[in-house]
Amino acid sequence: MSVRPTEITEILKQQIEQYGSRMVVTNVGYVVQVGDGIATVHGLRDVMASELVEFENGVLGIAFNLQEDSVGVIILGDYTGIEEGDEVRATGRIASVPVGPALVGRVVNALGEPIDGKGPINTDKFRPIERIAPGVVMRQDVDTALQTGIKAIDSMIPIGRGQRELIIGDRQTGKTAIAIDTIINQKGKGVICIYVAIGQKRAQVAQTVATLERYGAMEHTIVVAATASDPAALQYIAPYAGCAMGEEIMESGGHALIVYDDLSKHAWAYRQVSLLMRRPPGREAYPGDIFYLHSRLLERAARLRDDLGGGTLTALPIVETQANDVSAYIPTNVISITDGQIYLEPDLFYAGIRPAINVGLSVSRVGGAAQIRAMRQVAGRLRLELAQFRELAAFAQFAAELDPATKRQIDRGLRLTEVLKQPQYEPMPVEEQVAIIWVATNGYLDDVLVEHVREFEKQYLDYLRTSHPQILQRIASERELKDDLIQQLHEVTRAFKQSIWAPPQERVII
């Protein structure tokens, strides 16, 4: 059998035509120095700011400092397995997290990886953790209430969907409790909640998740946890990861609530990373861009225009103060960024006034626009009565005898303060809040002993639910107190006091 030269030529031609000379260019560098969760890498020539890089052992990092001859990388994982001389590859992408409905009910870390032992998250949608906030023309006014279920907040410091409301106070004053109650109260209201735990103990995060599960709130909640034992880099990116998950809901036309617990520890993590990277320190050793760290995060909360879906992302950042000092660096920064603050005081907390909200220093810059009309009708008088009470209470300490009008005002204030107390994990529907605040501001509690006010409230609301549910239904549906409804409330309240109300009997010891 002879091989003809023409056949050989034909085969060679086919081989040459089929050959594809594809060049794969990979941006590679080498670790020069590593330690304390950061690495200095030499040779990553075309790396982008905040680009993800991958180390030889599979651990990821973020290009944080871009210098002339090296790149400072923050390591998103265990840095103990990384050694000098290890290869580092640029991935060509910015840090992203999985987003979408599959995350609801799950506990994930700052990279969106599940840590609850319930298996993988089935989603093919990812979003970059850093994103420019919606512009002015993309937004619309905040005018829809986000009900927290907490009487003191919904009446005097209303929060709207798309607002940023700071919760600020010393440690152990009930900041997280307010946020958790708000999440529990969103059940059945079509709001997806994201709870971002930054720098907390793992046991504390587990306890929070257990509480949310006990009250059925995990069905509409995503928990993003970057605990105290996680690297500072993960604590730094955790809020941005949670925000990306919330933005997906907002841009899909849905409503999301995100709690950052807390931004003080977030600032500490960023300060730690920045100092290790040799960035110049400023006030309180924070880097110069610490304001931008929080402003670019909180500005992403918005209410979008209707033609963009009308979705909302509401932010409740938490900041811890030291010895009531709201003039420190981080508190003043976040106060200036947000649309109001809820200020919690240790003195009120230890006096048994819980939630320990100082309504004089707390404010919501959205105001009554985010309240239903019925709540606005009762809240105005409540605010005025409490303001007068605070003024007179300070004056009364120095007065030997009080005139009847002043004493009456102080007694009313004491009862209003008692009405605003509320146990933890018991958020109240807005129609019940309106009813009990109306009763208090219209003088029906003036002859009830202060220590019996809570029992009166319990019995009165039980009476409305069982005997007059139509009143609560009308408040909920009509969203205002019309004249005939007010008349009905007067009649029902008088009837309750005459025939139903039974004050607790004092125990007689023989």
UniProtKB/Swiss-Prot annotation:
The record marks 362 as: Required for activity. Belongs to the ATPase alpha/beta chains family. Its EC number is 7.1.2.2. It is found in: Cell membrane. HAMAP family: ATP_synth_alpha_bact. ATP binds at residues 169-176. Pfam families: ATP-synt_ab, ATP-synt_ab_C, ATP-synt_ab_N. It catalyses: ATP + H2O + 4 H(+)(in) = ADP + phosphate + 5 H(+)(out). SUPFAM superfamilies: C-terminal domain of alpha and beta subunits of F1 ATP synthase, N-terminal domain of alpha and beta subunits of F1 ATP synthase, P-loop containing nucleoside triphosphate hydrolases. F-type ATPases have 2 components, CF(1) - the catalytic core - and CF(0) - the membrane proton channel. CF(1) has five subunits: alpha(3), beta(3), gamma(1), delta(1), epsilon(1). CF(0) has three main subunits: a(1), b(2) and c(9-12). The alpha and beta chains form an alternating ring which encloses part of the gamma chain. CF(1) is attached to CF(0) by a central stalk formed by the gamma and epsilon chains, while a peripheral stalk is formed by the delta and b chains. One of its GO terms (cellular component) is proton-transporting ATP synthase complex. One of its GO terms (molecular function) is proton-transporting ATP synthase activity, rotational mechanism. It is a peripheral membrane protein. Produces ATP from ADP in the presence of a proton gradient across the membrane. The alpha chain is a regulatory subunit. Keywords: ATP synthesis, ATP-binding, Cell membrane, CF(1), Hydrogen ion transport, Ion transport, Membrane, Nucleotide-binding, Translocase, Transport. This is ATP synthase subunit alpha. It comes from the Bacteria.
